[in-house]
Amino acid sequence: AVEPVKKTLTFTLEKTATAETKVKLVFDERHVDEYNFDHATEYVVFPEKLCTIANDGVITIPAGETSAQIEVTLSPSASDLEYVTTYMVPLQAVAQTEGIVVKDEAEYVDFLVSRIGSKKIRNICYFEVNDCNPLNAIEYILEDGQPFFDAVVLFAGNINWDASKQKVYMNANPNVQALLDNSEELLQPLRKKGIKVLLDILGNHDQAGIAGLSDWGCEQFGKELAQICLDYKLDGIGFDDEYSSYSGSGKWFAGPSSQQAARLCYETKKAMKELCPWETWVHLYYLGYIQSSLPSVFIDGVEHKPSEFIDNVCADYGGAARPVNGMGLSGCAGNSIQLNYGNSISSESAKALMNQGYGCLLYTSPSPRDGATS
């Protein structure tokens, strides 16, 4: 059974009421369409029959007082709401007493309601986008309607050095760029199903590398990655330390180290929080300088443990990830399963990892082609 959710709202006057004052709270279904149009959202109207407003919605402020409260009760059952759908409860305050005006910014109270998934472990999948369309992730649905995959990682964008412009930048091959340019058609359907979409970043055979940027370089590149997430509506960045020569010099670069890898993760998370009005992840694949031993980052003498700016970690093929400092096993993948090599995991093994406290499983390189194992 689903317990009813009760919310208490307070209506406050700017001045003390000289006489009894009444305001009515009404359910205004039309407001949801208006809100969606203005904010480019896709909220669904919460069923009005499941919303009860005390006292028929009338808020009465006695003479001599400045405020009064009213209780709103939401009573959905498990079958009333769909997974991966966000519902809006659109409540409008309408003045009932002559001479009282409700300010525009206080006219609507919008509750957002979502059905909490029953899954106890997250499934994260790396898609080799040169071979496979990430939209295939939508095809894997559990019996109760939840998507099997919780996050898709696009493999991959690159960290590269532009010698002509003397800067480090994110380089996307034609397949990656096509996904970004066509985000509304090829990536946003995943997000609308509740599947996060991350862009993986790895080296590309030159001096630029994830673990070799100066503090200033980390800040600049982190801001670029955050801007990419904002522009293309992505849910975060993955880091994979491979294929870098680490031979750069100048203000962009520092000697490669786990300290600089941690700094890039910190700056990327910080920039995403500042730019993106949605939850974002920093996800790590343990290779090279990116390991569970990543150190803390100190900014103006304040320590920031890796768990503050890293959300999920995974090991290389077949391994279980150890947590970074401050993180529990809930942020770790208990196994990394390479699907295109025919690797798999039994439900018993997955449950055992879940019972040990691991919070996710990693899958790589699914293939929908005929004859492929996935």
Residue ranges and their predicted role:
Residues A1-Q146:
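Acidic/polar, low-complexity intrinsically disordered N-terminal segments immediately downstream
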Residues S118-N133, G145-V324, Q338-I345:
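Chitinase-like catalytic core of GlcNAc-active glycosidases
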Residues S330-S336:
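C-terminal EAL-domain catalytic cores of bacterial cyclic di-GMP phosphodiesterases
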Residues A350:
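Catalytic cores of alpha/beta
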Residues Y358-L362:
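Cysteine-clustered segments with highest specificity for TGF-beta superfamily mature ligands
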Residues Y363-D370:
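Conserved small/polar residues in nucleotide/adenosyl-binding loops
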